[in-house]
Amino acid sequence: MMNQLHRIKIRESFADAVYGGDKTFEVRKNDRCYQKGDYVDFVVLYDSDGCEYVDHPLSKKRYEITYVLSGWGIEDGYCVFGIKQVT
């Protein structure tokens, strides 16, 4: 099975933390069947309204999913996945 590329929205304050290397995980509804080895491109939105796109350096980076956790205290239908920058 080929690795999927997911384009997912992220608020600007969280984008800053990912871009700075402080946030190396995402908590997401698992409606896309995230898998280890999949890729993530982030689409950054303003914090204030969450509707407008931001020209943020994170939008030019790609991340690989390194680990996916579901169950074990994670709400049904959600997952936490680890990410590392690849470009």
Language-model-detected regions and their locations in the chain:
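Catalytic phosphate/metal-binding cores of nucleic-acid and nucleotide-processing enzymes, i.e., regions
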Residues: M2-T87
